């Protein structure tokens, strides 16, 4: 099949995830009890036998770079191949920042040359899915295509969120439009591409020299290939589980799908394991008299209260008399005694005091940003401390690093927020 090199686009900010991505890149956002989003793409690579991987970082890369390290959890700590972090080339003329997804790959053509790339797999580092990339590559080779895009049908009312394509009866793409206001199809790009390297190199150099381009695959490169008939592009239809968790609602829903009696996404398949960088922790502990129902509780967690339909990450502590429902509680968060939390997302290293009620009261629109904070979820940013006896309504936002003295009273009405700005 030729020498395949994977390029994982991992520089996205993920602004629609609000405080969850204020300090970390979207691919570094925790998911599913112990993972980070990029773990799924990295694991798909090694499960597909692809061991030459570049991770293109940009926005707040520290946590992501530390998480990946030399790639040992994914068996990518190799002398031949392996994983390499590829930040923008600081110091190069006008190149201190990747200008778009296509420019990010263009800036790393040298990396592809050094790895003798014949096929280039371009992937997003912030989606949740399991895919054998060999199926995509085999289809690409069968069609003798210059490029192939993985796609799936989506509800037509959601199609405007995606790159949308139209194909002929043979699967060849005849038209592509990025996030159209009035989509003419519901066949959506998954942001997963495979290209013949020499073809990709040619079109990226041409795109880089186009002053009118924003240097993005979906907005510029793919439409231009089709418009100017530069090569053949085919659509590979994927029928497995794939989720874009780019909004708080979709992130929350995808986590809670993991606790369904028959989850649509299987974390437990021994033939397709997902790997991550994690510290060793003891088994989870559920105290006598506590109740855990339809939930995922990760190692190191200590549950002294009651947990229903929730995802509890590693090292979380839940106090006596506390009830947690329909919630996502991230690593090393501690929740005190006699609390009630419903429909909340709490980031890492948060401390919630005793007798706190969160996610309660009347429905209300967010006063901070209704486009980001909706669906009546209350969200707490990392490293915050919620004082005892607080009552926090629905659709509230507690920012990063908030302290007890930042709360003006013991009640935060639905839709309200407490944010501490960085100096």
UniProtKB/Swiss-Prot annotation:
Enzyme class: transferase
Pfam families recorded: Hexapep_GlmU, NTP_transferase
Keywords: ATP-binding, Carbohydrate metabolism, Glycogen biosynthesis, Glycogen metabolism, Nucleotide-binding, Nucleotidyltransferase, Transferase
GO molecular function: ATP binding; glucose-1-phosphate adenylyltransferase activity
CDD domains with a match to the protein in the record: ADP_Glucose_PP, LbH_G1P_AT_C
Membrane-crossing residue ranges in chain numbering: none
EC number: 2.7.7.27
First and last residue of the signal peptide: none
Reactions this protein catalyses: alpha-D-glucose 1-phosphate + ATP + H(+) = ADP-alpha-D-glucose + diphosphate
GO biological process entries: glycogen biosynthetic process
Amino acids binding alpha-D-glucose 1-phosphate: 98, 163, 178-179, 189
Pathway assignment: Glycan biosynthesis; glycogen biosynthesis
Protein family according to the UniProt entry: Belongs to the bacterial/plant glucose-1-phosphate adenylyltransferase family.
Role: Involved in the biosynthesis of ADP-glucose, a building block required for the elongation reactions to produce glycogen. Catalyzes the reaction between ATP and alpha-D-glucose 1-phosphate (G1P) to produce pyrophosphate and ADP-Glc.
HAMAP family reported in the protein's UniProt record: GlgC
Subunit structure: Homotetramer.
Stated name of the protein: Glucose-1-phosphate adenylyltransferase
Species name: Thermotoga sp. (strain RQ2)
Lineage: Bacteria, Thermotogati, Thermotogota, Thermotogae, Thermotogales
Gene it is expressed from: glgC
